[in-house]
Amino acid sequence: EDTYRGEVNDPDTLHLYAYCKNNPINYVDSSGYKYSPQKAANYAYKWGVHPNPKYHEYSKDCTNFVSQCVHAGGKKMNVPREPLTPKTDELNMFWYAKRTKDNVWHITRPWRSVKIFYYYWKVHGAKTIVKSKFSEIEKQFKIGDIVQLHRNKDGWYHSVIISCKINGKFRYAGHTNNHSKNPVKKLKNKNNKWRIIRIK
């Protein structure tokens, strides 16, 4: 059973109840474990250049990759009860990347789409920050932040993750053009808006 504040149905889950009770509920999932932006960033740094073979890789892989990072940070996949089908993959209420026993991948739009990833996590409690000056968004960066880029001809078109600091300067990781520690100044190039998705 799920663990909720004020209710302990199973003595074996008492430690999870105590964890939930002493931490803000909007920062803790029902399993009693906290999301870790650092773990998400560590995954990004590790798999930024060479993709994790456990996952499907797209030719335009940016949001698929940041979803992997978020999952590594502690967010569980949101999977329907019914069997996975191409129809469930297109539903915006779910977030998963699963391979079936017959080796078919099922990956939802919120997992792989720049725009729908944003809307999914905004609904699920992420803090969002949007700026039209790079100097202003850069001041807001934290390790593990998802950053999305906008340009006039494409709209919101790319997702990356702040992966580390080197000599006091933030670096980011991303896929499509694979990298694990690019200087964040490169995010300024040819873009006119930036938004942070800070998952809790």
List the model feature ranges, each with a label.
Residues E1, D12, D29-S31, N78-E82, ...:
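Short, solvent-exposed loop/turn and secondary-structure capping segments
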Residues E7-V8, N52-H56, P183:
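A generic structural signal for short coil/turn motifs at secondary-structure boundaries
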Residues L91-Y172:
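...with weaker cross-activation on analogous glycine-rich loops/strands in unrelated enzymes
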